[in-house]
Amino acid sequence: MEKVDNRKPLYRSLYFQVIVAIISGVVLGHYYPTAGEAMKPLGDGFIKLIKMIIAPIIFCTVVVGIAGMEDMKKVGKTGGLALLYFEVVSSIALLLGLLIINIVKPGAGMNVDPSTLDTKGIAAYTGPGKMQGTVDFLMNVIPNTVVDAFAKGEILQVLLFAVMFGFALHKFGGRGTLVFDFIEKFSHVLFTIVGYIMKVAPLGAFGAMAFTIGKYGVSSLLQLGQLMATFYATCLVFIFVVLGTIARLHGFSIWKFIKYIKEELLIVLGTSSSESVLPRMMAKLENLGVRKSVVGLVIPTGYSFNLDGTSIYLTMAAVFIAQATNTDMNLTQQLTLLAVLLLTSKGAAGVTGSGFIVLAATLSAVGHVPVAGLALILGIDRFMSEARALTNLIGNGVATVVVAKWTGDLDLERMRRRLDDETDSEADEPEMVLDQTATHMPAVDPAVTRRG
């Protein structure tokens, strides 16, 4: 029988549409800067649409994943292994950034006097209360009310409530089936909405890129270009050497994985926010063969604790400012910087500008590097945010697959099949593919039913 070709025409693929949108945005922003800046609402509107759906998707995914598990001990094991992975790999990212910036030294010879820098532009990032302390950060994980957590879209707060709800629903056994089925069906509705939102992703990427080029100009890319080139190169080394090695040790190719999430990467490239594809990334990973409970726990947590691109940026930017302002940093001072960053880097979120806020807080905490030096990189920070967001996204995707492999929640055969023989429908509409699968409550435990 003749094989039917289900491939879409190129012009209908999200991959092609986003590429065209990004190029169009660059052209408009470069030749018509005022018009480019006016496109900002398109990018902002797209990200707001995504943020609108993130909290309920995380809630549904985590609840269904946990309530559907046979062994509750696996939830704690999954969370513990995820945090261990995050700490080790983000530490490697910090060390890699520190190593390369000391080898290349892009700031050496600039001889900038910090007192001559215009610090008005960085005032918004260095004001009081911009960066939480450790205790404040932990307390902020607990919402004032459940409604408040959803209303503000606080990912970790929603995650905490979802985990507790999932445990409680699991304890009900068969009596909780009605609630479980409702939440499971509701999650499919939400992912269908995500599919609708992604139809306008090219418009969002176009607007965000046109605004960036129109406001900051291509010329700002040429200034401080050595730092940008060094940072982008370091991110590539981290992705293909560090993450590539981790992927290979766990049975998959980083090249094939990147190809699998290419649409998400292009959207992130256009919007500079890895959060813009969080719901779609969850659908993609579940479609890849990762159990729903692992996806629901690892991905949202990773957006606060596993920001590899941001970690690289923080060490490189801090040492670059020291080099440019002729501020000597000996080994002890650099190790102190590293220790502070191990804490402050966990306070960044997957949104545009968070890395700059964390950097400002870190320089203030260390005290050795002049905070005024932030003005040096303010103009190009927006352009480096693309590499940060892309690296963060790939890092969280790899982390989810690895943790799933460790806990036995990864369908290896399905993953290999998806990475090798992905169809256009799976690439463009993972939300639709999920509708072909179903999750069920575990078998009723009579003892649990009697206790309830």
From Swiss-Prot:
Subcellular location: Cell inner membrane
Keywords associated with the record: Cell inner membrane, Cell membrane, Membrane, Plasmid, Symport, Transmembrane, Transmembrane helix, Transport
Gene Ontology MF term list: fumarate transmembrane transporter activity; malate:proton symporter activity; succinate transmembrane transporter activity
Composition bias, Acidic residues: 421-432
SUPFAM superfamilies in alphabetical order: Proton glutamate symport protein
Main location per the UniProt record: membrane
Keyword flag Lyase: no
InterPro entries documented for this protein: C4_dicarb_transport (IPR023954), Na-dicarboxylate_symporter (IPR001991), Na-dicarboxylate_symporter_CS (IPR018107), Na:dicarbo_symporter_sf (IPR036458)
Region of interest (Disordered), residue spans: 417-452
GO CC annotations, alphabetized: plasma membrane
Coiled coil (residue ranges): none
Gene Ontology terms: biological process: L-aspartate transmembrane transport
Residue stretches spanning the membrane: 14-34, 49-69, 81-101, 149-169, 189-209, 227-247, 294-314, 336-356, 357-377
Pfam families noted in UniProt: SDF
Bilayer topology: Multi-pass membrane protein
Family membership: Belongs to the dicarboxylate/amino acid:cation symporter (DAACS) (TC 2.A.23) family.
Function in brief: Responsible for the transport of dicarboxylates such as succinate, fumarate, and malate from the periplasm across the membrane.
NCBIfam families per the UniProt record, alphabetical: PRK01663.1, PRK13027.1
HAMAP family, sorted: C4_dicarb_transport
PANTHER family in UniProt: AEROBIC C4-DICARBOXYLATE TRANSPORT PROTEIN, PROTON/GLUTAMATE-ASPARTATE SYMPORTER
The protein, known as: C4-dicarboxylate transport protein 2
Organism per entry: Cupriavidus metallidurans (strain ATCC 43123 / DSM 2839 / NBRC 102507 / CH34) (Ralstonia metallidurans)
